[in-house]
UniProtKB/Swiss-Prot annotation:
Organism: Vaccinia virus (strain Copenhagen)
Protein name, UniProt field: Protein C10
InterPro entries: Poxvirus_C4/C10 (IPR005004)
Similarity section: Belongs to the poxviridae C4/C10 protein family.
Length: 331
């Protein structure tokens, strides 16, 4: 679950099992604590626990510029019927791209009770899962009825990227467009291909998601949006299926990038399990049309080069001029 305020800043983030990789490590830190309901333990800034938390937040939060984590971890224990009062917040963010949070990681979940209650303007939220919530929100830990609750609490500060532009989606929503990939799930690539005797398509547009899958958006026939959903597992497959001028290309050679780069993302951060977004509504298609027009208008000044090499003898080199814009679609 992701909840945002009226400025578009995230106020609540519910996690699933993202912190399982460090949960036991945090438990080990506090395994000898038996006679205290709350204790604080300073950590090294570059400790594995802090670094892993930072990596998870960079991956799971959207549009992030910087994540700072206070190196002190607070361990809190709640036994049955402990009385916990509502904690009121008077913290106010100083800018519209910065927020401070409490990150709560469960180390022991009670059998009954003990949920965290957040007082949110749109309705109260209760959770017994790992959660990060803005310090602008009042909160309360509900009574534990059966079992015990132990949690680790960390202070998190997040600076968000400012968008380079927004593109109208519908009467209520505009979508931020960025040149920075951190925290984004999709990348639109407006691609111009150097003249080559094997190339049939000289301009093409694809959306690439975090798995490297590509959705064909527009092709050389113009800036009109391709309505049939043509999804490829990689940009190399887009070349074979759409860009090249002959159907036998896949049988004659394969394509690689000498630097092991993906056309949109850092290859070491690809997530194979991510499904690609596809347009469904009229608003989706209108948004894509506006995105293509904007990318085309910027393609002479905002671009990079991407090279694929065919394993022929001698090697065949294909040079692509790529304008990239990163964004997140509504969920």
């Amino acid at each position: 679950m992701d909840i945002y305020d009226d400025k578009g800043l995230q106020t609540i983030k519910l996690f699933n099992n993202e912190f399982d990789c460090i949960r036991n490590d945090i438990r080990e830190l506090f395994k000898h604590v038996t006679d205290s309901d709350s204790i604080q333990l300073p950590m090294e800034d570059n400790s594995d626990i802090i670094e892993n938390i930072r990596k998870i937040l960079y991956r799971r939060l959207k549009n992030v510029e910087c994540v700072d984590i206070d190196s002190t971890i607070t361990f809190m224990k709640y036994d049955p019927n402990d009385d916990n009062k509502r904690t009121c917040s008077n913290w106010v963010p100083l800018t519209n791209n910065y927020m401070e949070y409490c990150l709560v990681i469960y180390l022991e979940t009670p059998i009954c009770g003990g949920k965290i209650k957040l007082y949110h303007p749109t309705g109260n939220i209760k959770s017994d899962k790992d959660i990060m919530f803005a310090k602008t929100l009042d909160f309360k830990s509900k009574k534990v009825l059966t079992g015990r609750k132990t949690i680790a609490v960390l202070d998190i500060s997040v600076s968000y990227n400012r968008s380079i532009t927004t593109i109208h989606y519908n009467d209520d929503v505009n979508i931020d467009i960025h040149t920075d990939k951190n925290g984004k799930e999709l990348c639109y690539c407006y691609i111009t291909i150097d003249d080559h005797y094997l190339v049939d398509v000289e301009t093409i547009g694809v959306i690439v998601n975090r798995s490297g899958k590509c959705l064909l958006v527009n092709n050389h026939l113009g800036i009109g949006i391709v309505k049939d959903k043509r999804i490829s597992d990689s940009f190399g497959d887009v070349c074979m299926d759409t860009i090249f001028d002959f159907s036998e290309a896949r049988e004659l050679f394969s394509l690689t990038n000498d630097d092991n780069r993906n056309i949109a993302w850092d290859t070491d951060k690809l997530d194979d399990d991510t499904d690609i977004w596809t347009p469904v509504t009229e608003d989706d298609y209108k948004f894509l049309s506006r995105l293509v027009l904007y990318a085309k208008s910027q393609s002479d000044t905002v671009f990079d080069y991407y090279v694929l090499t065919g394993d022929t003898e001698p090697p065949t080199v294909f040079i692509f001029k790529v304008t990239r814009f990163y964004f997140n679609m509504l969920k």
